[in-house]
Amino acid sequence: CALPIFNNIIPMPKDLLIEASTSGEFGMQYIIAQQRKPFNSQDDLKVIQWMEIQEEKVREEALQLGMTYLRNWGKYGYPTWYEWSIANWGTKWNAFNQNFEEPNVLWFDTAWEGVPLLIQTLSEIFPDVEFQYAYADEDLGSNVGKGTIRNGETDMTFPDNGSNEA
């Protein structure tokens, strides 16, 4: 059962739950490039060229998605769920493979790495609870950390990759 754990701590705006795609990114960049004419950069010209060789349906979809990305960027600072979740949760997806093996202990997986800032936010929501937090990458010996967090105050250690502590 996948519970939206991270979304309950730091809720993602629903408007951001849209497709994150290269064509949407190109649509957004194309709209921006059109506003800069005639002072386009080389990157602008590549995007313009890409848009001009697309079939009309693909071009229209890219432009529509690009407009939505720009609206979201202006409103939330991020075009889609992808950029927002990395910035706010520290990873691209919500927690998965959640497991409550014992009282007050939660195990979960993330897409990339630990989420100490998310746990810090949780500790600010519950200031009287001390969180003991540890994480490890599936690549043993790298990207590990552990410590305690209470009322937003963190005491974490991050061993060097490849060290005996890792």
PLM feature segments, named:
Residues 1-3:
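Short, small-residue-biased leader/transition segments that mark boundaries at the very start
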